[in-house]
Amino acid sequence: MSATAVTADGLEEIEVDVVAVWKEGYVYENRGDTSVEQKITMTKGMKNLNSETKTLTATHTVGRTLKVGDPFEIGSVEVSYSFSHQESQVSMTQTEVYSSQVIEHTVTIPPTSKFTRWKLNADVGGTDIEYMYLIDEVTPISVTQTIPQVIRSRAKILVGRQIHLGTTAVRIKHAERQEYMTVIERKKWPAATLGKSNLFKFVLFEDSSGTRIKTLNTMYPGYEWAYSSDQGGVYFDESSDNPKQRWALSKALPLRHGDVVTFMNKYFTNSGLCYDDGPATNVYCLDKREDKWILEVVNP
């Protein structure tokens, strides 16, 4: 199950079920007749924090929301659990998750006693979050311990807003050049070329023959469907069954804000949408080329 809330910057917040488990974080048996002090060092938060941004990459699926390789951020994590006949709840904010805080302190263990530190770990899309919470337990060595039990574990994650085919307006940005696909007039046709403006909008459609790219900024009404000419220039024509208007997308549905994709033409099957420094425009469909493009959701 998941719940969704739209946020700014092309992202949406989705609540998903995640895996959480109690583990032995530290165990010490003091079989002597005097107390013993032990120094414990632990890291609270993300175990392997190796990014300057909050963007993570999923290494396994999370329901129907995250697939392997998908980018996401962790907004918060919440776990309810039972221990010693009581139910409790603990949560971590985004700041706490990403802080990766190292904590060191000393505990005193009485004689003939066993010290156990239970740590609550959560896994969100392959990212391990350590010491969400801890429980220190001191028992006689011979006593069988009661392991805390997770009741429910949920996380709020931030992912790119879903691109709904046929309705969601997007910008199409060249991944390497960081310029947007725009529409200008060439040879009395609407034509695609790269530019700095992010005001040009497109809608992706899909039919049985492939993906279609519709511009919302044509200067000739009805001439709005991207196709490859025989010479490789990309223009916008009236709607038809022409396979030159169909494209094969490199990424499976659903598409999301921030997805990086390629567009291969369905007629010129070895040719892909790409940058090329032409005489008047620079968006082409050329043989053995498949440049990467970033899809950005246009805020309503």
Curated annotation (Swiss-Prot):
Location of this chain's protein in the cell: Secreted; Target cell membrane
Coiled coil regions in record: none
GO terms (BP aspect): defense response to bacterium; killing of cells of another organism; monoatomic ion transport
A GO term, aspect molecular function: toxin activity
Tissue expression: Expressed by coelomocytes.
Positions marked as site (Crucial for binding sphingomyelin and important for inducing hemolysis): W189
Residue numbers binding an N-(acyl)-sphingosylphosphocholine: K187, S229, Y235, Y284
Stretches for region Beta-hairpin domain: 36-109
Main location: secreted
Site positions per UniProt: Crucial for binding sphingomyelin and inducing hemolysis: W22, W247, W293
Disulfide pattern: C274-C285
Region (C-terminal receptor-binding domain): 159-299
Signal peptide: none
Subunit comment: Binds to sphingomyelin as a monomer by using its C-terminal domain. Forms a nonamer when sphingomyelin/LRP-3 ratio is lower than ca 500. Oligomerization, but not binding, is influenced by the fluidity of sphingomyelin.
Function noted in UniProt: Pore-forming toxin that specifically binds sphingomyelin in the plasma membrane of various cells. Has antibacterial and hemolytic activity.
Name under which the protein is recorded: Lysenin-related protein 3
